[in-house]
Amino acid sequence: MPQPPKRPRKPAPAAVKTAPAKGELHPRNRHQGRYDFPALIKVSPELGDFVITNPYGKPSIDFANPAAVKVFNRALLAQYYGIRHWDIPDGYLCPPIPGRADYLHNLADLLATDNDGQIPRGAGIHALDIGVGANCIYPLIGHCEYGWHFIGADIAPAALASARAIVAANPQLAGGIELRQQANAEQIFLGLLQADERVDLTLCNPPFHASADEATRGSTRKWRNLGKLDPRRKLPVLNFGGQAAELWCPGGEAAFLKRMASESAQVAGQVLWFSSLVSKGSNVELLQGWLAKAGAAEVRILGMSQGQKQSRLVAWTFKDGEARGAWRQSRWR
């Protein structure tokens, strides 16, 4: 394994980007405005069984119905990304696709800052998705949008089996997405990369909760809010057997981010940019402190907004501008 770089005498200050206007997606995000349900139903007829009229008289789906959300995601992936076959086992996270796409578009902009403003595209760009999950959503969107080569890593064999089935069912993904198991559940980056392997960026949506009980309470609260507190509403059965690693880890998000910061320094020579979503605002400052201690050369904080949800993307690198320029010359030319 390459040796960690020497710590800079004075860590560079974080470059903070103002969050976008509330509800505003990235300009390249395909999911602007209202959903075109007739077009979605055309590519995925089963969606028609789940379309309802919302209180504003517009077509929608019941986002508190897991079956409806899964079929809706399937239609979005088919309509916008050409993914014709997508399914996940019951009990796994069904991600909001517009928000996942926003993360990837912001990462593309990040790489462009080291490439004279041009987004580097194609299979020569390698991305490592930490916690790819059963849905494989980041590699699917990232490969379809930018042609990047993805490594999807997870600790759960069942999640990887689901992701492999998705990739195998869509021939256009062949060679563009590979999946690896992290054999040590206590590690994040360590043990995943070969000694001579280089990765241009990493991404992660870390587990938020600190325990299974906390995750259960949080999910129950979410379902009740979606159901508008209707006492007659039957809540879905919450099964966390398959998705425990997606929802919680000891110490919650903060502990995971601390470990990620520490491990990133140990593989710093192999990665250009590391990144992670951060759900809890107070954890951003904590992460900045851990990264300064680890010797990060630069940290960037990007605000993102989808509907009512505000989130943060934190990216960091152990390479200064000169080293990033050398990386570009050796890998992107």
Curated annotation (Swiss-Prot):
InterPro entries on file: METTL16/RlmF, rRNA_lsu_MeTfrase_F, SAM-dependent_MTases_sf
Keyword flag S-adenosyl-L-methionine: yes
NCBIfam families per the UniProt record, alphabetical: PRK11727.1
Location(s), subcellular: Cytoplasm
Name this protein carries in UniProt: Ribosomal RNA large subunit methyltransferase F
Region (Disordered): 1-31
Pfam (any one): Methyltransf_10
Catalytic activity: adenosine(1618) in 23S rRNA + S-adenosyl-L-methionine = N(6)-methyladenosine(1618) in 23S rRNA + S-adenosyl-L-homocysteine + H(+)
Signal sequence range: none
Protein species of origin: Ectopseudomonas mendocina (strain ymp) (Pseudomonas mendocina)
Function description: Specifically methylates the adenine in position 1618 of 23S rRNA.
Chief localisation class: cytoplasm
Taxon lineage: Bacteria, Pseudomonadati, Pseudomonadota, Gammaproteobacteria, Pseudomonadales
GO terms assigned for molecular function: 23S rRNA (adenine(1618)-N(6))-methyltransferase activity
